[in-house]
């Protein structure tokens, strides 16, 4: 059953899956790479269908999405964890 929110935020399930994954993995982004990729692909499809000027809460703006997709192609996939125990 889809709600009106799902129609305005078609990538909401993917965005929520990222939050769940991050919480389960102590916010280690590298453990959630595939799920993040799924969100970016959903957002890419959203913009292809609706135009780059449209917005949805769950997707980065079109220009930022383009940058993120390019970074992932270049292998710069995940944020790096900072070890706060090191001086």
UniProtKB/Swiss-Prot annotation:
It is found in: Mitochondrion intermembrane space. The keyword Mitochondrion applies. It comes from the Eukaryota. Gene3D superfamilies: CytochromE C oxidase copper chaperone. Keywords: Disulfide bond, Mitochondrion, Repeat. GO terms for cellular component: mitochondrial intermembrane space. Disulfide bonds join 11-42, 21-32. A motif (Cx9C motif 1) lies at residues 11-21. Pfam families: CMC4 (PF08991). A motif (Cx9C motif 2) lies at residues 32-42. Residues 8-50 form the CHCH domain. Belongs to the CMC4 family. The twin Cx9C motifs are involved in the recognition by the mitochondrial disulfide relay system. This is Cx9C motif-containing protein 4, mitochondrial. The lineage of its organism: Eukaryota, Fungi, Dikarya, Ascomycota, Saccharomycotina.
């Amino acid at each position: 059953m889809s709600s009106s929110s799902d129609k305005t935020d078609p990538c909401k399930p993917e965005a929520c899956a990222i939050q769940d994954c991050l919480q389960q993995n102590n916010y280690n982004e590298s453990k959630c790479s595939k799920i993040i990729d799924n969100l970016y692909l959903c957002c890419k499809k959203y913009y292809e269908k609706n135009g780059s000027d449209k917005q949805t809460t769950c997707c980065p703006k079109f220009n930022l999405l383009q940058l993120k997709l390019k970074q992932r192609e270049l292998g710069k996939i995940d944020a790096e964890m900072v070890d706060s125990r090191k001086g």
